[in-house]
Amino acid sequence: MDYEFLRDVTGRVLVRMSMGHEVVGHWFNEEVKDNLSLLDEVEQAARTVKGSERSWQRAGHEYTIWMDGEEVMIRANQLDFSGDEMEEGMSYYDEESLSLCGMEDFLRVVAAYREFVSKA
């Protein structure tokens, strides 16, 4: 899982992720922004579910993060879109609306994000 951290002209941190993990970047850009307490909450939840059968989730404005002891899933809240609402012959493209990654990989990105933000 490759990632890149950038700052836009206003100084806002932007996260870009490799193909298949774009939603992880969107989650950082839309949900975390400068809210490092959200990362505290996620890291605490990761410690709680690691090595157990439990899971944890947090719904945000645009994305929901879910984790169990081994993996993290981030999905766009709009994925609750019903197929019945689609016009005939149309399909809903959701490749960039859902990402799965391993817990350890995700926590490495969280740590790198914190480090990048602290270098303001």
Swiss-Prot record:
InterPro entries: UPF0231
Family to which this protein belongs: Belongs to the UPF0231 family.
HAMAP family: UPF0231
Name of protein: UPF0231 protein YacL
Organism: Salmonella typhi
Lineage: Bacteria, Pseudomonadati, Pseudomonadota, Gammaproteobacteria, Enterobacterales
